[in-house]
Regions:
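Short, small-residue-rich loop/turn micro-motifs
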Residues: 9, 17-19, 114, 118, ...
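Extracellular/luminal Pro/Thr/Ser-rich low-complexity repeat and linker "mucin-like" segments
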Residues: 1-10, 77-88
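Short, compositionally stereotyped local motifs that mark structural "simplifiers"
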Residues: 1-66
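Charged, amphipathic alpha-helical interaction segments
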Residues: 45-51, 151, 218, 243
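C-terminal/domain-terminus segments
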Residues: 234-241
Length: 249
């Protein structure tokens, strides 16, 4: 991947490619664009010599698939899956060079990711929910597709709540619905959900679909025998689960 660096025009930028701290005395001075292989961690600092001002260090990882993130590094448990899902344009970063792996996501964001994974098929019609007028144009087609295909459902009061945060249980259920839409048979999967100590916290209407996601290895526990079904799903968890789901197709 071709990399360019920038800093204070009055000074110089120094960088390393081995993960060590860059300093003016023993590391490379940036003179122009350079190429690095995937998996390289670039650490850079800008130094203005005449007054000794030194910028905060910047650290970026060039992933194996050519993504450039400051908060996704080799060794992170989600590294390969985030790299894959971002490279395929399914779940993009939240800002330039930022993925925000520990941030949650909304129902609209998840619908958009799954819609992209499906190839963004053409849709027609209107969202028939009490809060449909509040749906932004950026996610309208994705939500329409998700609702028409039974992947996302509204609430008993007639609202869709696209801005509501996704729980781990909801995420697992939607992964299962996506697989069923793609032709996956989930009728004879073993019961693994009951093996989690907090399985009783799962809404009865979600148990079959969430169990399928667990039995297929899409949703896994968080440690200590717990599933944390009602905990908020993070962007990293979502990328990992989508990647696992796609492997089942």
């Amino acid at each position: 991947m071709r990399v360019t660096l920038s800093g204070d025009a009055r000074g110089s930028v120094y960088y390393t490619l081995d993960g060590s701290m860059p300093t003016p005395s023993n590391t490379k001075k940036y003179t122009g664009a350079f190429y690095v292989p995937g998996g390289t961690v670039i650490r850079a600092v800008s130094v203005v010599k005449w007054n000794g001002i030194r910028s905060d260090e910047t650290s970026m990882t060039v992933t194996a698939r050519g993504n450039l993130f400051a908060d996704v590094k080799p060794g992170d448990w989600f590294y390969n899956d985030v790299d894959r899902i971002a490279a395929e344009g399914i779940l993009n970063g939240t800002a330039k060079n930022v993925f925000s792996p520990n941030v949650g996501l909304t129902r609209a964001m998840l619908a958009t990711a799954l819609y992209r994974a499906a190839g963004q098929p053409e849709v027609s019609g209107e969202l028939e929910f009490s809060d449909a007028s509040a749906v932004g144009s950026w996610c309208r087609d994705a939500l329409l597709w998700a609702c028409e295909n039974g992947i996302m459902r509204g609430y008993e009061d007639g609202a869709l709540r696209p801005g509501r945060s996704i729980s781990r249980a909801e995420l697992g259920c939607m992964m299962t619905r996506y697989l069923v839409l793609s032709g996956k048979d989930i009728s004879e999967l073993e019961d693994v959900l009951s093996g989690f100590s907090d399985a009783g916290a799962v809404n009865e209407s979600m148990r079959t679909e969430l169990n399928a996601a667990c039995a297929l290895g899409i949703v896994k526990g968080v440690g200590g025998g717990r599933l944390d079904p009602n905990g908020g799903a993070t962007r990293a968890q979502t990328a990992v689960m989508i990647s696992r789901m796609l492997d089942k197709l």
